[in-house]
Design a protein with these regions (language model features):
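Loop and turn regions of beta-sandwich accessory domains that flank beta-strands and are enriched
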Residues: 1-150
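Surface-exposed, flexible coil segments in extracellular/virion-facing regions
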Residues: 155-172
Length: 172
């Protein structure tokens, strides 16, 4: 956590800092400040000098559903758990955190388009993995439930000696 910065950008270029734990030097921080979260991992990291991933945990960020404060606040309070893969280290609990800058700063952004998650690792002494990421929008943005049903017009199966023989299906 100590050398990481994370930013979310919407299609028109507006952005917020999700967290900024890097407060030192290295390749140079992308954002000013940082809470110096060194020695704390996100997930159960395998810090043995290899490039093998550890065990990914789920970290969510929400202005309204957060169980915890910002990662900076929780780090300052010492709210960490012991790691199992790298004994003697601590990791942030998997939970829902407040972002450092409110998602309200993205009001007015177009929903359609490319949303970008920028994560910067400022020190080359370790590695990191993103196991999964997603973004969910408030359903009130588009309250019209949209669904569709495909109707099979014609379907055929062609027997053959291989499981890779094609099946032909037409939808209408």
């Amino acid at each position: 956590l100590g050398d990481l910065e994370m930013m979310l950008s919407c299609p028109n270029g507006d952005s917020i800092i999700v967290f900024n734990s890097f407060g030192g030097t290295g390749i140079g921080p992308a954002f000013a400040g940082g809470f110096n979260g060194g020695g704390t991992y996100l997930g159960d990291a395998l810090d043995d000098g290899t490039s093998n991933p550890g065990i990914g945990w789920t970290y969510n960020f929400s202005d309204t559903l957060a169980d915890w404060g910002t990662m900076a606040t929780e780090h300052g309070l010492g709210n960490t758990l012991p790691t199992t893969l790298s004994p003697g280290q601590g990791m942030n609990p998997d939970s829902i955190y407040l972002p450092e800058q409110t998602f309200d700063d993205l009001i007015g952004c177009p929903v359609n388009g490319t949303w970008k998650l920028t994560i910067r690792d400022n020190l080359a002494v370790d590695n990191g993995y993103i196991f999964d990421w997603a973004i969910f929008f408030n359903p009130y943005i588009n309250p019209n439930f949209e669904s569709y049903t495909s109707t099979i017009v014609d379907a055929q199966w062609h027997d053959g000696n291989s499981v890779n023989d094609p099946a032909v299906t037409s939808f209408g």
